[in-house]
Design a protein with these regions (language model features):
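The feature captures the beta-strand-to-loop junction immediately N-terminal to the Walker
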Residues: 36-38
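Catalytic Walker B motif of ABC-type/P-loop ATPase nucleotide-binding domains
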Residues: 146-150
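Helix-to-loop junction immediately C-terminal to a conserved catalytic motif
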Residues: 51
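ABC transporter nucleotide-binding domain
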Residues: 164-248
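Conserved ABC ATPase "signature" region
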Residues: 89, 101-117
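Short, charged/small-residue-rich alpha-helical element at the C-terminal edge
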Residues: 219-290
């Protein structure tokens, strides 16, 4: 995939506080990336730097030639006393767009606001309608790269479904590359190709949707009365495993009865054995814990 935008050791510091610390990442053309982190992780600060709203303390941002950018950062910047169509007309004037009326009607249709009462002021819109109007403002100039800061946050299930549909359509039908942030991993499950996990200003993990699905596959968990001897026995018999806190994690395809017989033959007592699939939330918390451990080394 060709790179659309990349950063190298991008940092933002206020006094001694490192809001964003040495972030190096690449956004590829045509993908939807999910930037995930708890409140205060530095997501919005990073997005504000990428969109050019604030400057970095150090590091570089490189984008492909003639890359146009649109952004919805934090609260939608709407004109509360204007209707949806007049909000877009106001933005079109700022952008000096030609054939603006035709483009405005097309954009309203993209976000599902084409049938809204033209006299209804945006201050009277529902949250979902305001978010969709904000996206309309961000895409009015046909950006190549679209930044969306928590556009799903606070929406009801219907609003979430509508927003996901809009985001996928912008990529699939209009070729936009999208970076979307959230503090909830599962919110992005249906739309993103790749996840970027952020914690305390750092990127702690990046993985594709396929890699996440593999990580969350059902696993066999084992606990015995002799942890070191169990690991040695598994290694001697070529059985792959991972350490997961107090448990030993094995493939769900492992033959349980054969495993138990093997351990009994080596005088190892099985205290607990069960199959379980890791949740999005559990995996996310594991990554945050890894981030905490990394942070102590800085």
């Amino acid at each position: 995939m060709a790179s659309l935008l990349s950063t190298q050791e991008l940092s933002k510091q206020y006094g001694k506080q490192k809001a964003v610390h040495q972030v190096s990442l690449t956004i590829n053309k045509g993908e939807i990336c999910g930037l995930v982190g708890e409140n205060g992780a530095g997501k919005t600060m990073l997005l504000r730097m990428l969109s050019g709203l604030i400057s970095q303390t150090s590091g570089t941002i490189t984008s492909s030639k003639n890359c146009r950018m649109g952004a919805l950062i934090e609260s939608p910047a709407l004109q509360p006393n204007l209707s949806a169509i007049d909000n877009l007309r106001y933005m079109a004037l700022q952008l000096n767009l030609k054939q603006a009326d035709e483009k405005i009607l097309e954009t309203l249709a993209i976000v599902g606001l084409e049938d809204v009462d033209p006299k209804k002021k945006s201050k009277d819109f529902s949250l979902g309608m305001r978010q969709r109007l904000a996206i309309a403002l961000a895409i009015l100039d046909d950006p190549d790269f679209l930044i969306l800061d928590e556009p799903i946050n606070g929406l009801d299930p219907v609003g979430i479904k509508e927003m996901r549909s809009i985001i996928l359509n912008l990529r699939n039908q209009y070729g936009m590359t999208i970076l979307i942030s959230s503090h909830i991993l599962s919110e992005l499950e249906m739309v993103v190709d790749r996840y970027i996990i952020m914690h305390k200003g750092l990127i702690v993990k990046e993985f594709s949707k396929q890699e996440l699905e593999q990580t969350l596959e059902e696993q066999l968990y084992l606990q015995t009365n002799n942890h070191p001897k169990t690991l040695t026995t598994l290694e001697d018999h070529g059985i792959a495993y991972k350490i997961d806190k107090d448990y030993i994690s094995l493939s769900s395809d492992t033959n349980v009865m054969n495993l138990i017989h093997l351990l009994i033959n080596h005088e190892i007592e099985v205290k607990e054995i069960f199959k379980q699939q890791m949740s999005f939330e559990d995996y996310y918390l594991t990554l945050i814990q890894e981030g905490e451990e990394h942070d102590t080394l800085l």
